[in-house]
């Protein structure tokens, strides 16, 4: 014979289908909230003079304190929310760029940095250059300049974060 207290304890931890669905919805909301609060970026250099790379890395230094926006640099595409791309896209690097983009989890965003990343820059009419990042992957934000200042790069990423917040 079971008592009321034993019955309550036994049934308290049984999973119900609606509990599981609620948990999935809550986890989805939690993941979205975390991405908005702390976007992780992946820096992808497709080639060129490296001027934009220096400015992107300068933007990540303590002087500019991008961590106040939650921005963190990650080494793996599987951990990144935003790809920050620099340099013109060549035929040789296009397949690698596409593969790395596909490895990023949804939702994923791309920021093209510099004249080369946006349009191909001075290399755009050469035989081996496809042009900017938008020829291979969808680009959400363009940050022109040769090279753009760290403040402009930070501003572009922050605008993307605001755009993401507005859409959710």
Q: Can you describe what each PLM-predicted range is?
A:
Residues 1-51, 56-68, 72-77, 106-108, ...:
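Iron-sulfur (Fe-S) cluster-binding modules
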Residues 57-58, 80-87:
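Short, basic, glycine/proline-bearing loop/turn elements
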Residues 73, 85, 90-93, 102, ...:
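Metallocofactor- and cofactor-centric catalytic cores in central/energy metabolism, strongly enriched
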Residues 82, 112-113, 117-118:
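Hydrophobic cores of alpha-helical transmembrane segments in multi-pass integral membrane proteins
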Residues 118-134:
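Glycine-rich, charge-decorated loop segments at or immediately adjacent to ligand/cofactor-binding or catalytic sites
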